[in-house]
């Protein structure tokens, strides 16, 4: 059925379907959950889609306008689990509730859409991940007079917390920005040609006029209750203001109300944080492994936070390391104070207190949207009540750390808010207002009176039962209640002749009769009416409490922010103490100095980790790293980047000591993977990432290059690797860790004194190999590639053939006086000492016994096979001598 019927066409439907179709017309691209009794129903195409996505039963009931009505539904009490599934699939859902009274309605009960649930506007606890923020982002491309794109304005909002941010970026930085922000939903204008990277988030097209710059700027000012945006540094960000206007319009429309908690704005600048492109975030496994799991990552190692607010802030810090060392030093000062705290303010006691803290940030968001539930408010009350004791834990050390002093001041409990919550909300309220028992006794006299009537029913019934037994002489007479028939007096069949005349039969059972008396009927009317009136009164009072709490939203947000920061700092302190980390230092001079550094994540996975030094300075800008596969080259490079990032985030670091000069960006070119969706080969991906590094790296950038050039032929790869390394030294001048299997590159320090060779060593043991994982000065002299292949389980015949062919390649290389292109092997033997099945035969025939010996591996022989081989070799020698060979 076509849901775009004209108004005239709609009139041919039943009244209820007319109502539905009008609502659906306002939400054409959204699934409409239409409330009918205890179910949310979907109709027509929505029903078909929901049945497919949610595995619901698709039914067909009746017809409207001559068309069968396809239906699918979900029970209202389980709606959140279905919403969660749909949102995860990128779908949006309009929740249409009954707002009219069925008892007084003529025709269909009045209904309206009360909110729209979209991937980027989630606030319900059941739909949100505890440790992940959800962002709605709008993007608008600014053009010059010639129609050329000059920038992209971004505005993104965390609706659950009210955090709003703006930025303007270069068009080619969009992918990196989206990877950093990771929005769940992206708003773009109808007809816009901006290409949103695949997988960046669910894309929603909205009318282009929503992005009008003048309207957006005014809407932003109205939202923040300011006359202008100069105080936020946003007055010149016209493209971002256009995006913000569309964002606020969309977010408010989905909630059907004002966004009362969006009262602050932060403008992000490219120079504010250390640059991390998508490849770097992926390769360093900050919050997700290369396999797509959440552990083991740097985040999973660091996240010992006691609150979900702290866990979310930690994730944000890891993706936003500040360039200025001032912020890092302030955080590290706080960590030091927490570690040195006296016994009465020790770290364990503080963290124990933090575990009792609720998610104030998200509760405040729901409060602002008037969707907070009773237990949200009781959790808020209990958290505020615990703040004085929490402040006592840190009061003794605030003088030693400015960050802790700032946190302490922000944790002052909002007294009026706490008083209201304490007086209004029951100690242990029900989950939902409709269940009653939410408002505290003593808060409202009328509610208390109605409750007394309902709650005193029990005693009245006991007294009535005793009186009626005495009056009638029926010893087993009972006075009871059920929801279907209300209150009644039950008399067994054999005693009905004793029933007084004022008993009126209410229900006949097989073995008993149920009656009601005028006195019981009067009480029933009063009791049931009191219960209904009490629930209605409680609903009204609860709504009033929500309204009364709205002025305290800024104070609640202040407390939430301070609690999250304190939690992360305490987690950093716990990690530093448990894992033996140290406070790094910072300098304005060029350089990185790490003594006995360790990879934080790998160290946690192994029994013993070999620590290594890393030094950069004005005289040492590029380290050529050679050594065997599995020797630890990639681990060494990654640990250097992670230690640097941790230092600037504000954490202690896994090292004996560490000192860092300024770092503006971290780049990585690690691993091999193609981009099938983008039609790019492994080598193309490698070169694209290398190009970005060569174009953007500065003398303050840290660059990790792992085996560049391996995706093409040997000579092409070697030439590219040499040229790239040379450019990084001569042009970029950045700190570079350059791992390679091209031995020729180890000659680079002779041309550039700022380059140095280091290697990871290993030793052979029989036909095996032991990796030492220690970084030493100088180049490696062997790759141990065949030994690694043997460890990997490559069949022995393949290993033997590889050894023979390696010998041949070495012979050819020596004969042609060309450099050895293989993996750092030892100098080749003299040509006349090398034999290989694939090499041209020498002028004199080789001895057959020698050929046979070359084909065997003694380690593979059993005792009997060795004896048989000995006899075989003797036969070959005698046969060879008999043929007249010397």
Swiss-Prot record:
<keyword id="KW-0547">Nucleotide-binding</keyword>
<protein>
    <recommendedName>
        <fullName>DNA mismatch repair protein MutS</fullName>
    </recommendedName>
</protein>
<dbReference type="InterPro" id="IPR036187">
    <property type="entry name" value="DNA_mismatch_repair_MutS_sf"/>
</dbReference>
<dbReference type="GO" id="GO:0030983">
    <property type="term" value="F:mismatched DNA binding"/>
</dbReference>
<dbReference type="GO" id="GO:0140664">
    <property type="term" value="F:ATP-dependent DNA damage sensor activity"/>
</dbReference>
<dbReference type="InterPro" id="IPR027417">
    <property type="entry name" value="P-loop_NTPase"/>
</dbReference>
<comment type="similarity">
    <text>Belongs to the DNA mismatch repair MutS family.</text>
</comment>
<dbReference type="Pfam" id="PF00488">
    <property type="entry name" value="MutS_V"/>
</dbReference>
<dbReference type="InterPro" id="IPR007861">
    <property type="entry name" value="DNA_mismatch_repair_MutS_clamp"/>
</dbReference>
<dbReference type="GO" id="GO:0005524">
    <property type="term" value="F:ATP binding"/>
</dbReference>
<dbReference type="InterPro" id="IPR007860">
    <property type="entry name" value="DNA_mmatch_repair_MutS_con_dom"/>
</dbReference>
<dbReference type="Pfam" id="PF05190">
    <property type="entry name" value="MutS_IV"/>
</dbReference>
<feature type="region of interest" description="Disordered">
    <location>
        <begin position="834"/>
        <end position="857"/>
    </location>
</feature>
<dbReference type="GO" id="GO:0005829">
    <property type="term" value="C:cytosol"/>
</dbReference>
<dbReference type="InterPro" id="IPR036678">
    <property type="entry name" value="MutS_con_dom_sf"/>
</dbReference>
<keyword id="KW-0234">DNA repair</keyword>
<dbReference type="Pfam" id="PF05188">
    <property type="entry name" value="MutS_II"/>
</dbReference>
<dbReference type="GO" id="GO:0006298">
    <property type="term" value="P:mismatch repair"/>
</dbReference>
<keyword id="KW-0227">DNA damage</keyword>
<comment type="function">
    <text>This protein is involved in the repair of mismatches in DNA. It is possible that it carries out the mismatch recognition step. This protein has a weak ATPase activity.</text>
</comment>
<feature type="binding site">
    <location>
        <begin position="627"/>
        <end position="634"/>
    </location>
    <ligand>
        <name>ATP</name>
    </ligand>
</feature>
<dbReference type="Pfam" id="PF05192">
    <property type="entry name" value="MutS_III"/>
</dbReference>
<dbReference type="InterPro" id="IPR045076">
    <property type="entry name" value="MutS"/>
</dbReference>
<dbReference type="InterPro" id="IPR005748">
    <property type="entry name" value="DNA_mismatch_repair_MutS"/>
</dbReference>
<dbReference type="Pfam" id="PF01624">
    <property type="entry name" value="MutS_I"/>
</dbReference>
<dbReference type="InterPro" id="IPR007696">
    <property type="entry name" value="DNA_mismatch_repair_MutS_core"/>
</dbReference>
<dbReference type="InterPro" id="IPR000432">
    <property type="entry name" value="DNA_mismatch_repair_MutS_C"/>
</dbReference>
<dbReference type="GO" id="GO:0003684">
    <property type="term" value="F:damaged DNA binding"/>
</dbReference>
<dbReference type="InterPro" id="IPR016151">
    <property type="entry name" value="DNA_mismatch_repair_MutS_N"/>
</dbReference>
<keyword id="KW-0067">ATP-binding</keyword>
<dbReference type="InterPro" id="IPR007695">
    <property type="entry name" value="DNA_mismatch_repair_MutS-lik_N"/>
</dbReference>
<keyword id="KW-0238">DNA-binding</keyword>
<dbReference type="InterPro" id="IPR017261">
    <property type="entry name" value="DNA_mismatch_repair_MutS/MSH"/>
</dbReference>
